[in-house]
Amino acid sequence: MKKRRSKKERQELLQQTIETNPFITDEDLAEKFQVSIQTVRLDRMELSIPELRERIKHVATKQHEEDVKSLPLEEVVGEIIDIELDRHAISIFEVKVEHVFKRNQIARGHHLFAQANSLAVAVIDEELALTAKSTIRYIRPVKLGERVVAKVRVEDVENDKGRTVVKVRSFVGEELVFTGTFEMYRSSNYSEEGNNL
């Protein structure tokens, strides 16, 4: 029979786990430590660790507004939690009632595409970035209440041709649910009036 951890030991491990993965849910923590969700919440309160939504907001305040050039941050579908222009980016999208089909509670595909596509635009280090071509694959349906984490990696930057290839992989937990390859048009010769393209 496995010996139960002491409260102090469990709380230390819980704190380490959250520091390593700030996006872990209370449900996942409860399962990991084989305790109730209420116990996890009480432990978090005692340790002054905020709930998941607050932890996400805290991570997201890394001045992403100043980083993203190609579109206003509010136009990104999902919440950017990490970005390094022309390298990689991560966003989180919470599937809510307005994103699903009423009949089966499955997320409409265009929301997953929009999360991936807007993150592919945001990662481009130019004033103008547009999707020239995309190849996408939906791997499994995403349901109401699930959290989709999209990870974008810039594969190839061809500044002389004004093109960049971006790969997107979206996950629910550890499970891959969506993949995409986006060929992005980029230009620094852009003005608000739309000329100089």
From Swiss-Prot:
Tell whether Transcription regulation is among the UniProt keywords: yes
Annotated protein name in UniProt: Transcription factor FapR
Q: What is the lineage of its organism?
A: Bacteria, Bacillati, Bacillota, Bacilli, Bacillales
Q: Which GO terms describe its molecular function?
A: DNA binding; DNA-binding transcription factor activity
Q: Which HAMAP family does its entry note?
A: Transcrip_fact_FapR
Q: Which organism is it from?
A: Bacillus mycoides (strain KBAB4) (Bacillus weihenstephanensis)
Per the record, the similarity remark reads: Belongs to the FapR family.
Q: List the SUPFAM superfamilies.
A: Thioesterase/thiol ester dehydrase-isomerase, Winged helix' DNA-binding domain
Q: Sorted alphabetically, which NCBIfam families does this protein's record hold?
A: PRK04424.1
Q: Which Gene3D superfamilies does UniProt cross-reference here?
A: Hotdog Thioesterase (3.10.129.10), Winged helix-like DNA-binding domain superfamily/Winged helix DNA-binding domain (1.10.10.10)
One GO BP annotation is: negative regulation of DNA-templated transcription
Q: What does this protein do?
A: Transcriptional factor involved in regulation of membrane lipid biosynthesis by repressing genes involved in fatty acid and phospholipid metabolism.
Q: Which InterPro entries match?
A: HotDog_dom_sf, Thioestr_dom, Transcription_factor_FapR, WH-like_DNA-bd_sf, WH_DNA-bd_sf
Q: Lipid metabolism: present as a keyword of the record?
A: yes
What keywords are annotated for this sequence in UniProt? DNA-binding, Fatty acid biosynthesis, Fatty acid metabolism, Lipid biosynthesis, Lipid metabolism, Repressor, Transcription, Transcription regulation
